[in-house]
Design a protein with these regions (language model features):
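Acidic, Ser/Thr- and proline-rich intrinsically disordered linker/docking segments
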Residues: 2-3, 9-86
């Protein structure tokens, strides 16, 4: 089952933008808190609540892994992933 998350994405040399991503709950291997990066400050300038939490997730895709910064605390992301599994 896929879970919809909101990713903070910043292509090299460009501004941060928000994008919806759908990930398989079984493909997420780690979730950790993300704070203090300049990308987060740019995101807050886009209108994201200043109290919002962010997490960095690791996604396993066909033998390769990639990371993504998403909106939500690690507990919130885990709850979304677990909701799909139950």
């Amino acid at each position: 089952m896929l879970v919809k998350l909101v990713e903070l994405h910043k292509p090299q040399g460009e501004r941060v933008f928000l994008d919806e991503i759908y990930v398989s709950s079984s493909a997420v291997t780690t979730i950790r808190s993300e704070s203090g990066s300049s990308m987060l400050e740019e995101a807050k300038q886009l209108g994201i609540n200043k109290e919002a939490s962010f997490s960095r997730i690791t996604i396993s895709e066909g033998g390769m892994t990639r990371t993504a910064v998403v909106v939500g605390s690690p507990a919130e992301i885990q709850a979304k992933l677990n909701k799909i599994l139950t």
